């Protein structure tokens, strides 16, 4: 094996990393009324549900067949192995937060089967091991022969992430050793002077970086960079007839292979692939010390956030190829905005924050998390959206599972990691990025700081943070002041508030007002802190009208509603059976009202709308005033399918 050193020694030897360090989700205990129930539903419902679905659909049986524990043909798509790994990662994170002997045994049993399915040299791709002569369509006739399509590297990238999570949760090496054995095979196979190629679906780069973090072995990070650097330089591999269903993989734009990654300045192609690639590039920038990678993803960020992101934080406009569209191409009814793309975007935004320490990335992260990401899972945790459009004529409903089931497993692994997005540390500074009720123990410059954050966010903008160092100590607390509270729904000019708000932001320590002098979007409070100190932040939450950049043709003459970080929508069930016939007047007033019995407890917006007959171009004819109710976008389609609208025709009067 390549890895001979002790894992801890490898970690200690790192010289480069992200300048900002996130506080691990294992150090943060979420207890608020918004996120805590979602995390518990994921633990108690969604993770077991997804584990069972992997059994029912033959995904786990594929490993048993590869291990010769049972006979039969491979079932499903060539990438189905990855769904097993992703749910295992989510289960491992869940174990860290909530020890569960039965869940651990289930993971142990799966790991044992995966180990038996692995070939002697480390290769792990069940469809080829089961029947080397007839693997699933797209797998290629030989190992690595069809990397654009096969997902051989994508699958094991998710395996590396799951194995790292399992090791961190249990301290046991059973899964990690399987991952290392496979990664060592990749190191022997690919690289300068060896086999050329790149993964058709990015992900292995992230997984290799995680293995590097755990082992300290530079070959893993070098290989991640090699795969990225091959893009735009290597054009080999199998090709397809234009009528072949796999012909889309011949498109270099679809795979982000149209230019070298360091020259790319526009997000193109498959959105999930792009998000995973950008996140992987951030890892190389930080862990490898390559500033040119940071410069490249900074350019790409300007393009995505400035021209290609939905108000909900979703990305990927086209259902054809699940891809980005042109600049400002953001249709609502046909928006693809895949749940996996939202998760990938969140992973990327967090890495950009860790690189730069700027609140604008946390602003985008918050928008994604509270809107276009959690819309992907139902409130009961048992049905899902693959796509997350911003308009529906009633044809969209949630599904219990999918043949291409990447999104539900991705939800299971993201949600338990949410506590890890709240705080971060840089030198003698503590960052407070998300306002999620919790208790935490955070180490700042060698001192342990007990924190208690209390809030009803996102329904209320009052935030109280009790700061308790083990002994009096001087350090800085950087509190993010959200862009939405500073007249900016998003960084840049893709979206703006149509109405002004002069409601102040109030910040105090122990009851004494503190002036807010923003630095990269943070209110910075540096003082000698002692037990019992309390920070109070008050963010006003008026209902705001949002307008899109004039170049976004789909939103021309329309407005959306936002309060705090939450984007709202109207559903037909609350508005006389229809939502697409509603227009909103500039003079209409909306009031926020908390309804504890609705949709697990939400704030709704009530007011008046004009209802009439909708027509092409979004105009409403013969409008009449009627009562109007809007709910948070993330909660739509939890009461059955029906009409839904985010962007409403605007009546200027």
Where are these regions (language model features)?
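Non-catalytic carbohydrate-binding regions of carbohydrate-active enzymes
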Residues: 288, 292-336, 342-397
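C-terminal beta-rich recognition modules with glycine/proline-rich loops and embedded aromatic residues
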Residues: 224, 297, 363-371, 376-468, ...
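Solvent-exposed loop and edge beta-strand segments that line ligand/cofactor-binding
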Residues: 16-19, 66-84, 137-155, 188-201, ...
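Extended extracellular/luminal ectodomain segments enriched in beta-structured repeat modules
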Residues: 471-477
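Extended ligand-binding groove/face enriched in aromatic
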Residues: 67-79, 85, 89, 95-202, ...
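Well-ordered alpha-helical scaffold segments within catalytic/enzyme domains
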Residues: 27, 33-37, 88-101, 157-172, ...
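C-terminal motif of bacterial Sec signal peptides marking the signal peptidase cleavage site
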Residues: 9-10
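Low-complexity, Ser/Thr/Pro/Gly-enriched N-terminal "stalk/linker" regions
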Residues: 13-83, 108-134
